């Protein structure tokens, strides 16, 4: 009999930025690394003979909580990947909701009906992961192994093993980041011992330290460039408000890429302007639209645009006392130097580290 710990990856930037990231790669967030540390503590006293992960960074980084402290090698297997999301890959969930809302509901609730061009079906994902888990389990008969995989794929497999038909898997639990399930493979029988345990994500005082953020059906913006005359007026007003409130600088003619963010309304809720590849010129969310995670979604768009244009770092120039400082610091922007005018350049490294 093989004991198999099946683990969802830690929080990745795609989760935070509200973008679809099936086969799309990306870094872990600061919270994600906190989850990895909590997972490492959980497995300190658990014997593990081998560790597997998909070949995507977010699972490899998560698996480092187990294989590194135990001095094991990491085995990468593409069959452990998340669902291929086809044409959805890299799109904001808000954009998917606007353009393909029915299929987005299917993705979360009516999984047997979910279809996306150039992507997998739920049944294909379920079959792929089950075959991979069984194959790996047979290879390590009599041992204990850990496998880091992805939320949708894990949900499809565990739902089947717990007796949910594909039509009902949408009623089954969703996995927290780094949630741990234990399976046993005994001959042909693959059974669930426990599912989706996240007890390691709580501190000794029972305060949650790193729980999962909202699902795909919750807040997510879509974006467009200003093209209408009335939008130019809105742009000027939002840009002026941003300059006054956040201490960002720069005239409109210095900006090379401008996006409005829409939070399910006709009027824009947010503004992102890039001064060039790797430099945010302006980032602003209307006061009445704050506390919904929209600011970090704008950072996500800046990250995507920078990476798509060959950049490896992202920066913004702020006044030292800018109220925007906290948002950027929370999202791993570090002060690197001051300008001659006394402003501070904050920079974020967009590269995935290669040591996991």
Please provide the spans of the model-predicted regions.
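Conserved beta-strand-loop-alpha-helix junction that forms the acyl-donor binding cleft
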Residues: 315-325, 342-343
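Conserved acetyl-CoA-binding loop-helix of GNAT-fold acetyltransferases
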Residues: 34, 285, 291-304, 330
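Acidic, low-complexity terminal tails and accessory targeting/binding regions
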Residues: 87-95, 159-229, 348-356
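Acetyl-CoA-dependent GNAT
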Residues: 236-281, 286, 299
């Amino acid at each position: 009999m093989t004991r198999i710990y099946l683990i969802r990856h830690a929080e990745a930037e795609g989760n935070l930025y509200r973008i679809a990231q099936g086969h799309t790669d990306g870094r872990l967030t600061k919270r994600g690394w906190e989850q990895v540390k909590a997972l490492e503590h959980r497995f300190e006293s658990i014997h593990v003979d081998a560790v597997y992960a998909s070949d995507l960074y977010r699972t490899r980084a998560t698996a480092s909580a187990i294989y590194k402290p135990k001095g094991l090698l990491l085995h990468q297997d593409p069959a452990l990947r998340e669902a291929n999301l086809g044409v959805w890959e890299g799109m904001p969930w808000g954009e998917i909701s606007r353009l393909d809302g029915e299929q987005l509901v299917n993705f979360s609730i009516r999984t047997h009906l979910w279809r996306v061009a150039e992507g997998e079906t739920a049944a294909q994902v379920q079959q792929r992961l089950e075959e991979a888990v069984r194959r790996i389990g047979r290879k390590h008969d009599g041992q204990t192994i850990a496998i880091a995989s992805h939320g949708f794929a894990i949900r499809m497999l565990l739902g089947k093993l717990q007796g949910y038909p594909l039509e009902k898997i949408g009623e089954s639990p969703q996995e927290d980041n780094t949630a741990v399930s234990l399976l046993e493979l005994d001959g042909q029988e693959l059974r669930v011992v426990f599912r989706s345990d996240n007890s390691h994500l709580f501190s000794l005082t029972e305060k949650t330290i790193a729980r999962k953020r909202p699902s795909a059906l919750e807040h997510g913006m879509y974006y467009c460039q200003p093209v209408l005359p009335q939008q130019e007026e809105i742009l000027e007003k939002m840009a002026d408000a941003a300059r006054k409130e956040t201490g960002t600088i720069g005239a409109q003619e210095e900006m090379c890429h401008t996006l409005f963010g829409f939070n399910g309304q006709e009027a824009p809720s947010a503004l992102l302007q890039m001064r060039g590849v790797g430099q945010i010129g302006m980032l602003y969310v209307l006061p009445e639209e704050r506390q919904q995670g929209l600011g970090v979604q704008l950072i996500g768009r800046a990250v995507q645009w920078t990476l798509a244009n060959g950049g490896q770092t992202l920066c913004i120039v702020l006044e030292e006392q800018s109220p925007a400082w906290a948002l950027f610091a929370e999202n791993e922007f570090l002060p690197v130097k001051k300008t001659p005018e006394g402003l501070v350049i904050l920079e974020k490294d967009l590269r995935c580290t290669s040591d996991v």
